[in-house]
Every structure is written in structure tokens, then in C-alpha cells.
UniProtKB/Swiss-Prot annotation:
This is Serine/threonine-protein kinase Sgk1. Residues 50-78 are annotated as: Disordered. The lineage of its organism: Eukaryota, Metazoa, Chordata, Craniata, Vertebrata. Protein kinase that may play an important role in cellular stress response. Plays an important role in activating certain potassium, sodium, and chloride channels, suggesting an involvement in the regulation of processes such as cell survival, neuronal excitability, and renal sodium excretion. Residues 68-78 have a biased composition (Polar residues). Residues 85-342 form the Protein kinase domain. ATP binds at residues 91-99, 114. InterPro entries: AGC-kinase_C, Kinase-like_dom_sf, Pkinase_C, Prot_kinase_dom, Protein_kinase_ATP_BS, Ser/Thr_kinase_AS. The gene is sgk1. GO terms for biological process: apoptotic process.
Length: 418
């Protein structure tokens, strides 16, 4: 009787045939002058580019073949690929991948690189949200409190966002450590957040996912909003949308009611975050999600007396259950900006970062990871993330992934490159 470790002659023969077939298909896939030009071979491999016009738009580009590098700028610039970077540490995780601290080999600058698995995105049918995130990131470059995208590219299996590296820690981390903030500190953060939201609204973008985990502090202590996967584009000032999305603790009543909602949903979330900064928990929090939803819909807002009248008035206006009566419903950001709670704020100085932040994260440099969770930073970086394979076996799933993210890659103009 054969043991489990013994291989039958038939198995050895089949393995040899499979290896030979893989080599043959790789040659076909990576050599445009090879038999791939034959229509029957194309049909069998199913790697012809899609012809449906609805899959393309004026900004789209064909999906890259496995041997094709992504051009990040004019022809004088190098093509982007994972091996252009040294991936140093994992600094965050999400549903579809990881965020890593990386150093660019050419200029030795540090970036946060968001690496997403295409298969995971397609499995959950989230490709539209990922492309929306990329589109919003492209518009962020002109605002100081929004994370910036330097460029993006893709391999056959992954998407790469090359982002500003922000290492002052999540607002969530600092709230957990300190429990709550004094009113001047909460006001400063709320003002910078409101400024960022107002800018997004001016571009007809609704953020929809404001929460302490998506609010970062930079190395000086200024606010930076990140994670734009739930943003909704093309929402005019009086426009609405109806997708049920967000984080339970911060959902507005109209979202829970599954009613059409508008940009005032972001002002509700600002109220929830401001409340949490002042009191230590979201306004209608319960460990029981169903009870928390009922609280959001029906429970009156309860404010303890340890805040000023202006803070109380602002929270009551932001956490108004009727969105048509909510502060910001008429004149959006201008209503928030002109509220008496923010009277100590010089908004021109704020936007120009001339106001000294109330808290300094005291980071010594890019390699200072004290404000990141050790659960992430102590995990080994997978070697595959930084590899740029010269060729890869094309499968139907890889072809589907390439088509789903056409137009993802982005390079800035030459003068702003890196």
C-alpha cells in the first residue's frame, strides 16, 4: 500500500503537463506577436478587450495587461510599480486590504500606501465605491484638512493609492486615551472638520461617513479627513440620495428611516462627533444596536450642564432629527461657520494653519509610530505587496478585475509629480 507522501506515476505526469501548459499560456499572454493574435486562441483564453461602449468613458483607459507598466506621468517619468517602494510597516487595515508606511526609492519620501485586493472588492460588489473614493481624492489637493492623493496605479490583483502619510494618530485613538476633550480643543477640531466638509459640499460631494476613526491628526495636530469610500458624488445643493450606508453610532434619523437624505447628513455626523468629543460617547449610544437606532429615531437629545450655552445650542441644531430644520439646511457650511460657538475662530487663519493646534502629537519623524496600533505595526509586511511580477497567468477572474477598474490609475501633472 502506498503512503500519502508517495506520488503515483499518473500524478507526476499530470503535474508535468500542467506546468508545461502554464508556461505556454504565459508566453501567449505576455507576447503580443505570439499566437494570441489568432482569433480562436483569443476566444479560448477570453482575453480580448471589452467592446461594450458602456464600459468605457472619456476618462477611461484600457485595462493594463500583466506585462504592461502603468505610466504615472509624461514619458520622461518612470512607470509606477510596487517595487518602486520599500514597504516598511503595516499601519492600518480595512475590509479590502491594508495601509502601509512606504518610502519611495527615487525621492526617499514617505507615503501611506493603501493596497486593496481586487477580488475582495469584486466579491462584495464595491468597485463603484472604490472608484468614487479615487475620484474624490483627486479633488482633495486644494484643501489642507483632506488627505491628498499623489498618484494611483494597479497590478493585475491589487489597487494602490499613494497618499499623504499622516502619523499623529486617529482622533478615535486620542479620545479613547483621554476620554473627552475640553471645549476649546473640541471647537478647534470641529472647525477644521466643518471646513473640510464645507469644501466637499462645494464640490457636490456628501461625505457620509464622518466618525473619529476617519479623522486623523497630522504631525502638528491639525485635522485630516481620510477614507472617502462612502462619499456620494454629484449631489447638488438641493439634491438627495437614498443609499443606506454609514456607521451605526453616527447614522442620521433620515438614513435609518430609509428616506431620501441630503448633505445635512454630514452636519448630523459633525454633531455626533462634537458630542462625543465633549462627553466621551456618541449622543444616542447603546451596546444594543437596535436600541441605539430607536434612540436616534425617538429619544430626545440629553445634554449635561457642563458645556457652554453656545455649545449646547450648536449640538441641538446639528442633532435636530428633522433635517429640514437642522443647522446647515439652508446655507450649508456658512450657517456652521457663523454660529456663536465658533466666534473665537478666525476662519482665514484656520484655513491657512496659522492657529496653533491645542494638542501636539510630538512625533519625532516619519518613523515614529507611537500613535499607531501595535496590532498593525508588529505584523510582518507580506513580500507580495512590493513585488512587480514580469508576467502572470491570466485567468477569467483577473480579466474581470482589470475591466472593473479601468481608469483607476492616475498621475499628477509633471510639475506636481511626487
Amino acid at each position: 500500500m502506498r503512503t500519502k507522501n508517495e506520488k503515483s506515476p499518473l500524478k507526476a505526469f499530470m503535474k508535468q503537463r500542467r506546468m508545461g501548459l502554464n508556461d505556454f499560456i504565459q508566453k501567449i499572454a505576455t507576447n503580443s506577436s505570439y499566437a494570441c493574435k489568432h482569433s480562436e486562441v483569443q476566444s479560448i483564453l477570453n482575453i480580448s478587450p471589452p467592446q461594450e461602449p458602456e464600459l468605457l468613458n472619456e476618462n477611461s483607459s484600457p485595462p493594463p495587461s500583466p506585462s504592461q507598466q502603468i505610466n504615472l506621468g509624461p514619458s520622461s517619468n518612470p512607470h509606477a510599480k510596487p517595487s518602486d517602494f520599500q514597504f516598511l510597516k503595516i499601519i492600518g487595515k480595512g475590509s479590502f486590504g491594508k495601509v502601509l508606511l512606504a518610502r519611495h526609492n527615487a525621492d526617499e519620501k514617505f507615503y501611506a500606501v493603501k493596497v486593496l485586493q481586487k477580488k475582495a472588492i469584486l466579491k462584495k460588489k464595491e468597485e463603484k465605491h472604490i472608484m468614487s473614493e479615487r475620484n474624490v481624492l483627486l479633488k482633495n489637493v486644494k484643501h489642507p484638512f483632506l488627505v491628498g492623493l499623489h498618484f494611483s496605479f494597479q497590478t493585475t490583483s491589487r489597487l494602490y493609492f499613494i497618499l499623504d502619510y499622516i502619523n499623529g494618530g486617529e482622533l478615535f485613538y486620542h479620545l479613547q486615551r483621554e476620554r473627552c476633550f475640553l471645549e476649546p480643543r473640541a471647537r478647534f477640531y470641529a472647525a477644521e472638520i466643518a471646513s473640510a466638509l464645507g469644501y466637499l459640499h462645494s464640490l457636490n460631494i456628501v461625505y457620509r461617513d464622518l466618525k473619529p476613526e476617519n479623522i486623523l491628526l497630522d504631525s502638528q495636530g491639525h485635522i485630516i479627513l481620510t477614507d472617502f469610500g462612502l462619499c456620494k458624488e454629484n449631489i447638488e445643493p438641493n439634491g438627495t440620495t437614498s443609499t443606506f450606508c454609514g456607521t451605526p453610532e453616527y447614522l442620521a434619523p433620515e438614513v435609518l428611516h430609509k428616506q431620501p437624505y441630503d448633505r445635512t447628513v454630514d452636519w448630523w455626523c459633525l454633531g455626533a462627533v462634537l458630542y462625543e468629543m465633549l462627553y466621551g460617547l456618541p449622543p444616542f449610544y447603546s451596546r444594543n444596536t437596535a436600541e441605539m437606532y430607536d434612540n436616534i429615531l425617538n429619544k430626545p437629545l440629553q445634554l449635561k450642564p457642563n458645556i457652554t450655552n453656545s455649545a449646547r445650542n450648536l449640538l441641538e441644531g446639528l442633532l435636530q432629527k428633522d433635517r429640514t430644520k437642522r443647522i446647515g439646511a439652508k446655507n450649508d457650511f456658512m450657517e456652521i461657520k457663523n454660529h456663536m460657538f465658533f466666534s473665537p475662530i478666525n476662519w482665514d487663519d484656520l484655513i491657512n494653519k496659522k492657529i496653533t493646534p491645542p494638542f501636539n502629537p510630538n512625533v519625532s519623524g516619519p518613523s515614529d509610530l507611537q500613535h499607531f496600533d501595535p496590532e498593525f505595526t508588529e505584523e510582518p509586511v507580506p513580500n507580495s505587496i512590493g513585488q512587480s511580477p514580469d508576467s502572470i497567468l491570466i485567468t477569467a477572474s483577473i480579466k474581470e478585475a482589470a475591466e472593473a477598474f479601468m481608469g483607476f490609475s492616475y498621475a499628477p501633472p509633471m510639475e506636481s509629480y511626487l
